[in-house]
């Protein structure tokens, strides 16, 4: 114990206990893992202690209960080599222990092991020892530093960085530009750049005069123009155009044209839309349209040289639609077409067909000569060129499209017709002109006057879009805006939205239809409909629904007619609405099927029959071949049949004859052209209402007929008759005589069989004759016709009285036009013919191949032929020389000049008796077969040969083939003496038409008019 008690007394008073110090009063600046703070000092190595080594958990047997902190040998840097398992604190290089005096020799060293238990569980250290001090020992002094060598550790101060120099704005902009340029270069190399970095750098660049800012604006312009062009369509073109003008199109016109060409080549069906967009821009900025046309033409030229079919097709289609919009003159389209068709190949013809389909209607309207030339070239290629069958079919389809008036290829669609014709500016650019495409406009170039140009375009944009006036109006509205005006605007917008949806109109129609269908009789239906509150201006919808309800029924219901009559009789407003609906439905009647058409016609027929609407509505009907369709003709037929059924034929005719209605009926019963008159007559005759056309028939019969000009007498001539009221025929006549007499026109005008008396025979067949005449006492006539054979052959013998006095021959009435050539030989010294007796011998052969025209009105058919006063005067005086060659045969002969219809060829050889006057002067031509011989009874022999290419005359009883062989004595009267001459005539003809000898009226009563 003594040794134990003395050991603490030997120690230094400072070593026994720690005096309170700031470091001892505060917790140790160790981390929770036991390491010390860097500020603590590392204690010096303690002196050797001879006392045996104590375990970490062993305490010193000091009587004082005070705990002292001392470093164990494990905690010292130079620990005993026998120390085992050092704690982690001894291995930490940053651990620094507090220096404390080591215990003296012989005194046990007190150790406190803090690693055995956590700090949270260890009791707090005692600050002061509770035990009294040892005897004979002064109390230990209390120092703040708790030892002579203890000093608080100073914290190491980090060196302050040098002050950063503040950059100026110019330096910041320079750095941003450099960074932006670096990023652009990286992006051009394919490196991905985050968009936010680019946006941040772009926001930092604000100087508009710099190259980087203008390049950013150029990229934004390019992106915007390209996006607007790509999203345009028919529905939004009106909204895209203002946005497009919002961009600087003068600066970006190259970009705009480039985007248009790319988009059009990629999507050909949108070509009309792109052409319309270009036309709108061309009205305000002509340089844009001109640049587009130049690039298109240059593009076509390059593609044509490279044989690039796809680019040629797209370019020609775009040019065609620009021509339709009048952006470029149509001459460029004509030049391209002629270039493609100059050396036709399958591809070039296909491109030309596509171009012509698009621009054909415009060329037909504006330049018909170009269109005709192009189609002639197509026709030649189709017939002569060696092209593929597919290409031939394409040309045939093109001709069919032309025949259909380009119904599927209009010039401009209605929804794209946004440019007024007078506002359009047309450029004239030829296919062979020198063209500058201005490719430099596609790339970025720095503009030193960038701000000035932008200001100028802003002014131009304000003029185009009217922004200035709009801004002023907006300012005024803002100054005077109130809550009431805002509410009115909202209500107006709401109403506009409702109008666009047509919901109210659909509901109104549904209500009207249900009211009609739920009614038992017309009065109830009218009462229900009158109770409906129709919106203002929607009265026409009620009328339309009544007609539509009637049309959709399977059969016509009189219920609907009575309902319409009830409304039409209410007041004048409803009557006018029904009359307007009549005109509307007649103009659109071709849209309805036959059953609906029938119901609508009977509905309006009921309204007209009951006088619910005025009959002046017939003014909208024009009954002719051009202005009617099959549907409209069916509508008129059913309408008039219903009128006839309701009011009767007599009343209908009387109503149609009223003077007050005649102006309104001019379209149904026309009096303008014979063609329209005949069409109306035939139409009403076909629907068994010919009695309505009596007045038109009379008018048609009395219409003046154009007269033919008289040809010269001593020359070969041709006369062509104009169209008469029935039909048109052309006639040619030529006469040449080989006799000593003058050349004259030989005509035989006959419609009746031969009779006595002085008369001129009339025929409808012109003849061309050359005559040489010799007269004999006997005549034989043979006629051969090249027409289908007749059904029967008839032989007859009958007396044929020749004409009296002048000796003119009479032919049967012939309805077939003929052109005859006859040769008559007349010897110089013919035997004299005795007074009052003469004979001719003729042989005639005729061929006919033409349909015979109907007889003209007013010609005598049976009986004595009319004789003109001039003929009587010439016969009485005997001084007038009759010239010409006449043949007495039953072959057709020419009509008078003013009645000529059609010329045909006839060649005949005839021998026939020629009646002459006994007291006529010598050398006078008194017969029709040739000139008569002088007095003394000389005989004249006549040969005539005729060939007729026309069908023989129509007959009353006989049709088909007919062969007539006749022998008849012909009494000849001259100077009150009657002589007989015998003529033998034989005719054979084949005809495909009927012969009629009786008179035929030009318009049969209530029959079809040809």
From Swiss-Prot:
Family designation: Belongs to the CWC22 family.
Q: Where is the composition biased (Acidic residues)?
A: 468-491
List, in alphabetical order, the Gene Ontology terms for molecular function in this entry: RNA binding
Provide a GO CC annotation, any one. Answer: cytoplasm
Superkingdom of this protein's organism: Eukaryota
Q: Which organism is it from?
A: Neurospora crassa (strain ATCC 24698 / 74-OR23-1A / CBS 708.71 / DSM 1257 / FGSC 987)
Q: Where in this protein does the record put region Disordered?
A: 1-166, 466-498, 708-1010
Note whether Repressor occurs among the keywords.
Answer: no
Q: Name one Pfam family in it.
A: MIF4G
List compositional bias (Basic residues) regions by residue number: 753-775, 834-846, 899-910, 936-948, 976-1010
Q: Which gene encodes it?
A: msp-1
Q: Where in the cell is it found?
A: Cytoplasm; Nucleus
Keywords on record: Cytoplasm, mRNA processing, mRNA splicing, Nucleus, Spliceosome
> What's the name of the protein?
Pre-mRNA-splicing factor cwc22
Instruction: Please describe what this protein does.
Output: Involved in pre-mRNA splicing.
Bias kind Basic and acidic residues: ranges:
29-39, 65-78, 142-158
What range(s) does the MIF4G domain occupy? 222-405
Where is the sequence biased in composition, kind Low complexity?
18-28, 84-109, 718-732, 776-787, 911-935, 961-973
Relate the assembly described in the record: Associated with the spliceosome.
Q: Name any Gene Ontology BP term.
A: mRNA splicing, via spliceosome
Keyword Protein transport in record: no
Organism ancestry: Eukaryota, Fungi, Dikarya, Ascomycota, Pezizomycotina
* MI domain ranges (all copies): 507-623
* Amino acid composition bias (Polar residues), ranges on this chain: 1-10
Which InterPro entries did the record assign?
ARM-type_fold, CWC22_splicing_factor, Initiation_fac_eIF4g_MI, MIF4G-like_typ-3
């Amino acid at each position: 114990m003594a040794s134990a008690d003395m050991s603490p007394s030997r120690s230094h008073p400072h070593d026994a206990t720690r005096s309170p110090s700031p470091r001892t009063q505060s917790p140790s600046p160790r981390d929770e893992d036991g390491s010390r703070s860097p500020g603590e000092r590392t204690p010096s190595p303690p002196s050797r202690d001879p006392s045996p080594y104590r375990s970490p958990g062993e305490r010193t047997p000091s009587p004082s209960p005070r705990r002292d902190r001392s470093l164990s040998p494990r905690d010292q840097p130079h620990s005993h080599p026998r120390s085992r398992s050092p704690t982690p604190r001894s291995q930490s290089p940053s651990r620094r222990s507090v220096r404390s005096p080591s215990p003296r020799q012989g005194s046990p060293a007190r150790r406190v092991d803090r690693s055995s238990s956590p700090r949270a569980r260890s009791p707090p250290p005692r600050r002061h020892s509770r035990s009294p001090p040892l005897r004979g020992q002064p109390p230990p002094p209390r120092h703040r530093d708790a030892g002579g060598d203890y000093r608080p550790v100073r914290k190491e101060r980090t060196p302050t960085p040098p002050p950063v120099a503040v950059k100026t704005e110019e330096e910041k902009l320079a750095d941003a530009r450099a960074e932006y340029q670096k990023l652009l270069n990286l992006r051009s190399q394919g490196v991905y750049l985050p968009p936010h970095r680019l946006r941040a750098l772009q926001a930092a660049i604000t100087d508009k005069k710099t190259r980087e800012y203008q390049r950013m604006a150029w990229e934004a312009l390019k992106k915007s123009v390209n996006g607007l062009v790509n999203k345009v369509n028919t529905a939004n073109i009106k909204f895209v155009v203002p946005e497009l003008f919002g961009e600087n199109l003068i600066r970006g016109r190259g970009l705009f044209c480039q985007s248009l060409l790319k988009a059009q080549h990629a999507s050909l069906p949108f070509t009309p839309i792109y052409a319309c967009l270009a036309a709108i821009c061309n009205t305000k900025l002509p340089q844009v349209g001109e640049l587009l046309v130049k690039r298109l033409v240059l593009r076509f030229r390059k593609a044509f040289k490279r044989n690039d079919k796809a680019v040629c097709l797209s370019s020609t289609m775009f040019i065609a639609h620009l021509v339709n919009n009048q952006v470029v003159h149509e001459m460029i389209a004509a030049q391209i077409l002629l270039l493609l068709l100059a050396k036709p190949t399958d591809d070039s013809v296909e491109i030309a067909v596509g171009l012509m389909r698009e621009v054909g209607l415009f060329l037909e309207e504006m330049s018909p000569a170009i269109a005709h030339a192009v189609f002639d070239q197509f026709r030649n290629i189709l017939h002569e060129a060696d092209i593929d069958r597919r290409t031939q079919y394409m040309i045939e389809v093109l001709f069919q499209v032309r025949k259909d008036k380009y119904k599927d290829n209009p010039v401009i669609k209605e929804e794209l017709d946004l440019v007024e014709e007078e506002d359009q500016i047309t450029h004239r650019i030829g296919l062979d002109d020198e063209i500058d495409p201005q490719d430099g406009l596609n790339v970025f170039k720095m503009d030193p006057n960038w701000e000035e140009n932008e200001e100028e375009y802003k002014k131009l944009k304000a003029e185009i879009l009217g922004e200035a006036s709009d801004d002023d109006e907006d300012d005024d509205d803002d100054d005077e805006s109130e809550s009431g005006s805002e509410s009115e605007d909202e209500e107006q917008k709401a109403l506009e939205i409702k109008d666009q949806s047509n919901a109210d109109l659909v509901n109104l129609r549904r209500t009207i239809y249900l009211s009609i269908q739920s009614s038992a009789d017309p009065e109830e239906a009218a009462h229900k409909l009158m109770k409906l509150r129709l919106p203002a201006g929607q009265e026409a919808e009620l009328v339309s629904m009544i007609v539509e309800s009637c049309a959709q029924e399977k059969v016509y219901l009189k219920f609907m007619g009575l309902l319409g009559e009830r409304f039409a009789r209410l007041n004048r407003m409803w009557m006018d609405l029904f009359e307007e609906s009549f005109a509307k439905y007649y103009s659109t009647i071709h849209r309805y099927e036959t059953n609906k058409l029938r119901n609508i016609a009977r509905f309006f027929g009921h309204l007209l029959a009951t006088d619910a609407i005025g009959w002046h509505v017939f003014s909208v009907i024009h009954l002719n071949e051009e202005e009617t369709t099959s549907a409209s003709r069916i509508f008129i037929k059913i309408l008039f049949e219903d009128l006839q059924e309701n009011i009767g034929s007599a009343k209908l005719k009387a109503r149609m004859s009223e003077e007050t209605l005649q102006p309104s009926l001019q379209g149904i019963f026309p009096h303008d052209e014979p063609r329209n008159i005949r069409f109306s007559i035939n139409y009403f005759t076909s629907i068994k209402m010919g009695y309505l056309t009596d007045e038109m028939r009379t008018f048609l019969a009395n219409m003046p007929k154009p007269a033919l000009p008289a040809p010269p007498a001593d020359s070969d001539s041709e006369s062509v008759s104009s169209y008469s009221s029935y039909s048109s025929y052309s006639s040619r006549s030529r006469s040449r005589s080989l006799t000593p007499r003058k050349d004259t026109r030989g005509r035989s005008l006959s419609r009746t069989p031969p009779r006595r008396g002085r008369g001129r025979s009339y025929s409808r067949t012109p003849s061309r004759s050359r005559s040489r005449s010799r007269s004999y006492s006997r005549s034989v006539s043979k006629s051969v016709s090249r027409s289908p054979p007749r059904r029967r052959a008839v032989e007859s013998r009958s007396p044929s009285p020749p004409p009296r006095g002048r000796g003119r021959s009479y032919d049967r009435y012939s309805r077939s036009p003929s052109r005859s050539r006859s040769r008559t030989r007349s010897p110089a010294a013919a035997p004299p013919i005795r007074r009052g007796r003469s004979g001719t011998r003729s042989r005639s052969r005729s061929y006919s191949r033409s349909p015979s025209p109907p007889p003209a009105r007013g010609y005598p058919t049976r009986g004595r032929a009319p004789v003109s006063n001039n003929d009587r005067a010439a016969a009485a005086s005997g001084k007038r020389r009759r010239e010409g060659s006449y043949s007495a045969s039953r072959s057709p002969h020419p009509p008078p000049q003013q009645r000529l219809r059609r010329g045909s060829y006839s060649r005949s050889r005839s021998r026939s008796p020629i009646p002459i006057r006994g007291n006529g002067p010598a050398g006078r031509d008194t017969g029709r077969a040739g000139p008569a011989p002088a007095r003394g009874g000389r005989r004249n022999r006549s040969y005539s040969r005729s060939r007729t290419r026309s069908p023989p005359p129509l007959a009353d009883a006989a049709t088909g083939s007919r062969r007539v062989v006749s022998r008849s004595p012909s009494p000849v009267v001259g100077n009150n003496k009657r002589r007989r001459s015998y003529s033998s005539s034989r005719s054979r003809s084949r005809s495909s038409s009927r012969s009629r000898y009786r008179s035929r009226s030009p318009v049969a009563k209530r029959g079809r008019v040809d």
